[in-house]
Amino acid sequence: MAILLGLVVGVLTLVAWWVLQNYTYWKRRGIPHDPPNIPLGNTGELWRTMPLAGILKRTYLKFRKQTDGPFAGFYLYAMKYIVITDVDFVKTVLIRDFDKFHDRGVYHNEKDDPLTNNLATIEGQKWKNLRQKLTHTFTSAKMKSMFSTVLNVGDEMIRVVDEKISSSSQTLEVTDIVSRFTSDVIGICAFGLKCNSLRDPKAEFVQMGYSALRERRHGWLVDLLIFGMPKLAVKLGFQFLLPSVQKFYMKIVQDTIDYRMKRKVTRNDFMDTLIDMKQQYDKGDKENGLAFNEVAAQAFVFFLAGFEAGSTTMGFTLYELACNQDVQDKLRAEIDSVLERYNGKLEYDSMQDLFYMEKVINESLRKHPVVAHLARIATKPYQHSNPKYFIEAGTGVLVSTLGIHHDPEFYPEPEKFIPERFDEEQVKKRPTCAFLPFGAGPRNCIGLRFGRMQVIIGLALLIHNFRFELHPKTPVPMKYTINNLLLGSEGGIHLNITKVVRD
């Protein structure tokens, strides 16, 4: 009995020592930080009253003038992180010294949760090789070849909206309709599939997209492990994605591969690149090829990124245009002028002339960055010029995109929607990393060109054809949902829509 009691006391002593060491790390280092709570660290409000984006924004804005170094300490559950408070050091981490911070340090489980093992999460040389292979899929030439396909989906969206406001109410929840637009765009551009999401309210592509991003497989305790201790979660075999989501996307990818291989279909698209890599793997070239599960994972993340990031950006932009009618009028005038110069047609070349549109989208992404924070991990020890701010290998790094975008030093009156902030002269006055909607450096968003193209096409068609005004159901200022991985609106964005009548 005495031996057992001694063992229990010994174990409890070790646990207490670990807790004390872990949660006093930043205090012992003398690094400014908010006092942590055990076991949630500085994230006690997470998914209950505030999204992680809000917590990190608050931390950034609080400590940006209160620290004698480039970062503050932070505890994401039990993991020690830094929150960068100096945009020049953001550039150091993302660009200058990328070789020391090249991994994101987030959960991915190749064995038990294969779709999470994708370009956004994988690490080291494996990531570098895959990134190089996929980059050519998103060249300007490829975008130009897909333009008419995206435009056709956009024209269908206009017909659907026109029918809805003619036959029933003039009020629509716009994030729903633009989500269906981006779902159909990604379906046809990535998989060669006509998803019919715009016409079918129960389209499986849309429902599975929502499930992958918003439905939780576990309660908060397992999520604590997955997000706070990802390596331990992998060792324990925990899975993040729902089984129904895994099954759906695996089947879609397998069916697409089978169809193209049997019929010798070539579309020169993202899926063709992945199929080529799978064939290399099947021939024994493991270094340059991809196994089926890896192919499915890349297709999955491409769909989710295009579906959610594109639709959310469009939704937030329509919201801001409804709040700022003068901006909406100015944008519509530009669209009409460009269309008139190109015989009433939106073309790839005419899209390049929508300069004010670019500023409007950038200002929307500034106020509401869909990816509201960036994550990295120190893969090597890093010595800052101030010795106190040494970073140990394995320390997590967080960049609050939302915080930087709302920093009054870079954006005076940050809550106001002012597209002119992105006039060329104004942009030159700001640091490089004061605007990070797509990240920066070698690990920025690979699908940036595609994402911008689908957003510009969708918004140009909508603003040309319809006027958007606020509905009382939509809050001002915007309220963000507390349980999304990406930034999203709480309760949707309900707007009044009327058709633009021209003489």
From Swiss-Prot:
Pfam families: p450. Belongs to the cytochrome P450 family. May be involved in the metabolism of insect hormones and in the breakdown of synthetic insecticides. Gene3D superfamilies: Cytochrome P450. InterPro entries: Cyt_P450, Cyt_P450_CS, Cyt_P450_E_grp-I, Cyt_P450_sf, Insect_CytP450_Detox. It is found in: Endoplasmic reticulum membrane; Microsome membrane. GO terms for cellular component: endoplasmic reticulum membrane. It is a peripheral membrane protein. The keyword Endoplasmic reticulum applies. One of its GO terms (molecular function) is oxidoreductase activity, acting on paired donors, with incorporation or reduction of molecular oxygen. Its cofactor is heme. This is Probable cytochrome P450 6a19. Keywords: Endoplasmic reticulum, Heme, Iron, Membrane, Metal-binding, Microsome, Monooxygenase, Oxidoreductase. PANTHER family: CYTOCHROME P450 (PTHR24292), CYTOCHROME P450 6A16, ISOFORM B-RELATED (PTHR24292:SF100). It is an enzyme of class 1 (oxidoreductase). It comes from Drosophila melanogaster (Fruit fly). Heme binds at residue 445. The gene is Cyp6a19. Its EC number is 1.14.-.-.
